[in-house]
Regions:
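Thiamine diphosphate
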Residues: 91-103, 127, 131-134, 140-145, ...
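A glycine-rich helix N-cap at a beta->alpha junction
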Residues: 78-89, 170-182, 205-209, 446-461, ...
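Flexible, small-/acidic-enriched active-site or ligand-binding loops
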Residues: 470-473
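A short, small-residue-rich loop immediately preceding and capping a beta-strand
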Residues: 20, 56-57, 108-111, 141-159, ...
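Conserved acidic/glycine
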Residues: 1-31, 151-152, 156-157, 178, ...
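Short, surface-exposed connector motifs at secondary-structure boundaries
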Residues: 51, 147-148, 208-211, 421-427, ...
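Cofactor-binding active-site loop characterized by glycine-rich and histidine/acidic residues
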Residues: 30-172, 385-386, 418, 525
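Short glycine-enriched loops at secondary-structure junctions
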Residues: 89-95, 375-381, 388, 406-409, ...
């Protein structure tokens, strides 16, 4: 029976990829046995309740092998993955896109495809489960109690981010993380002996992982036994499973020819004969469906029913926790953060926005027990520390400060995993110039609709002495170009509070907070509520103004000072604070016209960053005071003066407008 089911997985993959004339059959054919063993013997999921909070998670880190996952979901009974959807693999509007997409297809726990990010994201799942278990489980009531399983390939383990995350997972002793390594000695360009020769198991042992080897990737009992041993090891586990890529293909198995191209009609026919598969394309024997129903769907439904009874009993036994747990199960925050939670700030108060951010995040932390995060070894520079808590580790699982180490990319993927798991609000910080290291993870935050908060400090050339390696220039423009990411560069402590409030109440959009090291003064015109519009008027000296200054962050203070100087000379000036171009661009035409009237063409945008994205606001008649070269090393006042960010120079720029 098991051999029939394994071959059903293989041929669903082969046939769908042939029909699409696009895809990666090799991993489907080689990894089918380990995936079958995992789904039918270990994985606890309920296809009728795909979002069950306590389900085991499965991450196909080798996302190019998506037909392996779609075949498993179809056979397991997930309604989203019908046979029609299998036949529509990689087609417009289908539930079976080229790489798995979270939120698009039920049963997909994470978007994967960029190699290395899946296994790294899985680390976040495991850490989320551990925190929620420590927070809410009570004796006899293990409400949060599940494993995170991964299938990865050689390519995943070549990527640096997987090494970052594996080092972190070993340090944290995330013992409910089990990785099956599809070790087939082949990559797209040829054999791994030409590019990847170290002992992966030795490396993972050094990280503090349990490791094992299954020498025959078709030995279902050996795979099952290895997983059982891994679960009892007390460590994260990597099981190397030696497989043959394209298993069963007489002329292509074991070669890179089967990695990323359809088998084609002739080789498919030969493979059918070699594996004894006497069925037509997309024909699956009923006994295969029965096998998956009994060993995946029915087993999972039974586990779900047992768990729902446990939750009901838990609510009676622990009513003080019941409301919070119920909210988490329903996909809500256990406590609502409101604007009233933040203290009212006086005009003239001076503080670096990184410090304002720490004050704001501690307001959130005091209100929301499932709010946690950290920094890539810069907590005392990024100001990301929750003051009431210590560091989280295996013996202090309830603490909410996470020390990610100098692992920016892994930090982003781990945050994504924690957000994907559900039940948590998470954040992570680093210097803004190092946002490039984490950007690929930020992109997957945005693509998956995860409300992760990224805290980026030391936001401009005002860093000064550290020089151009640490002074962001192009970074704001780059992040603003990303779909579904809200970038906030607040002008002062008041706007920083508002940005944090919007970040932790966002449902499907991540947030990047771009913050200063230097002090900024709270302007009289800044407004907590208006930050939600992305831009608003902070200063105006005449109703019939004919000049608009648009500024963000630290340059709002500069723009207001310049406007007052211009006003003293008889000019009629409006200053607009634009903490988020992304949010402002989503406002209706009437609001945009209210803030930036089309009739007023004398406009100057002021920002210590690349100028390119400001021309859509100032037009051909306006000007941009920005930076389109790299920074320099000197005391900050000298650097700012040399780059023209002074009241005198800004006044001159305005006066030079036609």
């Amino acid at each position: 029976m098991s051999n029939l089911s394994v071959n059903a997985i293989r041929f669903l993959g082969i046939d769908a990829i042939n029909k699409a004339n696009s895809g990666h059959p090799g991993v489907v054919m080689g990894a089918a046995p380990m995936a079958y063993s995992l789904f039918t013997k270990q994985l606890r999921i309920n296809p009728a309740q795909p979002n069950w909070i306590n389900r085991d998670r499965f991450i196909l880190s080798a996302g190019h092998g998506s037909m392996l996952l779609y075949a498993l979901l179809h056979l397991s009974g997930f309604e989203d993955v019908s046979m029609d959807e299998i036949k529509s693999f990689r087609q417009w509007g289908s539930k079976t896109p080229g790489h798995p997409e979270f939120g698009h297809t039920a049963g997909i726990d994470a978007t994967t495809g960029p190699l290395g990010q899946g296994i790294s994201t899985a680390t976040g799942f495991a850490q989320a489960e551990r925190f929620l278990a420590a927070k809410y489980n009570r004796e006899g009531y293990n409400i949060f109690d599940h494993y995170t399983y991964v299938i990865c390939g050689d390519g995943d383990l070549m990527e640096g981010v997987s090494s970052e995350a594996a080092s972190y997972a070993g340090l944290q002793k995330l013992d409910k993380l089990v990785v099956l390594y599809d070790s087939n000695d082949i990559n797209l360009d040829g054999e791994t002996k030409d590019s990847f020769t170290e002992s992966v198991r030795d490396r993972y042992n050094a990280y503090g992982w349990h490791t094992d080897l299954v020498e025959d990737g078709t030995d279902l009992e050996a795979i099952h036994a290895a997983i059982e041993t891994a679960k009892a090891s007390g460590k994260p586990s990597l099981i190397e499973v030696k497989t043959v890529i394209g298993y069963g293909s007489p002329n292509k198995q074991g070669t890179n020819a089967v990695h990323g191209a359809p088998l084609g009609a002739d080789e498919t026919a030969a493979t059918r004969q070699a594996l004894g598969w006497d069925y037509e394309p997309f024909e699956i024997p009923e006994q295969v469906y029965a096998d998956f129903k009994e060993n995946v769907a029915d087993r999972g439904a039974s586990a779900y029913q047992t768990w729902t009874k446990l939750v009901a009993d838990y609510k009676e036994a622990h009513p003080e926790l019941a409301a919070e747990v119920e909210a988490i199960i329903d996909g809500r925050d256990p406590v609502e953060v409101t604007p009233a939670d933040f203290p009212v700030l006086e005009n003239g108060f001076s503080q670096a926005t990184r410090n304002s951010s720490q004050d704001a995040l501690n307001v959130v932390a005091a209100k929301l027990p499932t709010f946690l995060g950290g920094s890539a070894d810069l907590a005392h520079s990024n100001m990301t520390y929750i003051k009431t808590d210590g560091l989280q580790d295996d013996t202090n699982r309830l603490n909410r400060n996470i020390q990610f180490g100098v692992r920016e990319f892994a930090m982003g993927t781990i945050l994504n995993g924690m957000a994907l798991h559900g039940g948590l609000r998470v954040y992570g910080g680093t210097f803004f110039v190092f946002s490039d290291y984490v950007k690929a993870a930020v992109r997957l935050s945005a693509l998956q609709g995860l409300p992760v908060t990224y805290v980026f400090t030391h936001d401009s050339i005002a860093v000064g002495e550290d020089g151009p390696t640490h002074e962001p220039v192009e970074h704001l423009a780059g992040l603003r170009a990303m779909p579904n990411l809200n970038v906030f560069r607040p002008a002062d402590a008041r706007e920083t509070q508002a940005a944090w409030y919007l970040a932790v109440t966002s449902e499907k959009t991540p947030t990047a907070l771009v913050l200063t090291r230097q002090n900024l003064t709270v302007e009289e015109g800044t407004d907590f509520d208006k930050v939600a519009k992305g831009a608003y008027v902070v200063y105006e000296n005449a109703a019939d103004f004919d000049t608009i200054l648009i500024a963000t962050g630290s340059e709002v203070n500069l723009a207001v000072s310049a406007a007052k100087e211009l006003a003293s000379q008889g000019a009629k000036v409006r200053v607009v604070s634009m903490p988020s171009t992304d949010v402002f661009d989503k406002q209706d035409a009437a609001y945009k016209e209210e803030i930036l009237p089309n009739a007023v063409r004398r406009r100057v945008a002021v920002e210590m960053g690349a100028s390119q994205n400001w021309y859509k606001y100032v037009g051909l008649d306006g000007a941009v005071l920005g930076i389109d070269t790299f920074g320099a090393s000197a005391p900050a006042p000298k650097v700012l003066a040399e780059y023209g960010f002074t009241v005198e120079n800004l006044v001159k720029v305005v006066q030079n407008l036609k």
